[in-house]
Amino acid sequence: MQETTNKASTPVKKQQTKAIVIANPTSGSYTLHEHQIKHIIAKLQQQGWQVELKLTQSSGDACRLASEAAQQHIDVVIATGGDGTIHEVIQGLAGSETALGVLPSGTVNVWAREVGIPLDLNGASNVLLNGQTRRIDLGKIDDQYFLLMVGIGIDGEITQAVEKQSMKRLKFFSYLLMAAWWGARYPAFRGTINLGDREIKVNALQVIFGNTQLYGGAIKYTWQAKCDDGLLDLCVVRRQSVLRRAAMIIDFLLRRPKRHQWVRYETGETIKITTHKPVAIQVDGEPLGHTSTSEAEPTLLSVGPQALKVIVPVTAPEDLFSRQPL
């Protein structure tokens, strides 16, 4: 009989998670939460993470720092701030193996609300430690990536008006004020949307191209969107009278089934749009110029399938995904 030898198995050492935290030291949210952010970094380090705080100094730094982290094979880039900070960070992470984590401290925090990341920073840090990693799509307009949505029309005009220097300090209240003003007065616009296999003519108040479902923290214009299905969802909000606009907004806020009557809903992988006159664009809540009026050089939207790894709660809404976690 052959003698067998029992050897004690050597425990496999868990690989240390390497991460950087990107924050803007001049933002009010960082000043307010600086002590808590540093406490969270210490908490992650106590759990075996190797974490370094990176402070931005000028526009574009968050993208550069994220890109450098991806090139250095850092496991996680943690964006501290709002959706604007996330928008800048994903420009540097797109197509990489580095995951996006979030400590939400912005005004609306649409991405955090979308996937259920707690808005208190300590709760959000628990998601970093105990959440699940998924790979999702990114939308792209011309050469810029977006995580959430692109809006053309009313919201583009509002976003660009709010970004004027005199209105930046009270951005949230300025947005509400401008929304009320533009909501009643916006004249709508005409354009053509090419979805590859079909072309549609629009007379619209706004057009939303969604990678995700939630818009502005409350409304779901692209309510069928899944952020990992390789498609953009398109919601054309048709031209309405002022009174009907109010009724439409109420239907969307309450998510009534009859909200379908106000819009045309489509999906596509590559979408081209031209308008009769230049129309303002917003991308993830940030202003981005105007639409093209040239059929030869239309405004182009596309999808980067599975372009971004994200850390989200294990309780993230299932209807937002079509694939399993990694």
Can you annotate each of these PLM segments?
Residues 1-77, 317, 325-326:
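ATP/NTP phosphate-donor binding region
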Residues 2-3, 7, 33, 195, ...:
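ATP/nucleoside-binding phosphotransfer catalytic cores, i.e., glycine-rich phosphate-binding loops
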Residues 45-47, 56, 74, 94-99, ...:
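Catalytic core of DAGKc-family lipid kinases
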Residues 62, 84-89:
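Short glycine/serine/threonine-rich phosphate/pyrophosphate-binding segments
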Residues 79-83:
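N-terminal glycine-rich "phosphate-gripper" loop used for MgATP/nucleotide binding
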Residues 151, 208-221:
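Glycine-rich phosphate/pyrophosphate-binding beta-alpha loops
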Residues 156-158, 201-203, 215-218, 242-245:
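Short acidic/glycine-rich loop or secondary-structure boundary segments that cap or lie
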Residues 166-174, 223-244:
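Gly/Ser/Thr-rich active-site loops/lids in small-molecule metabolic enzymes
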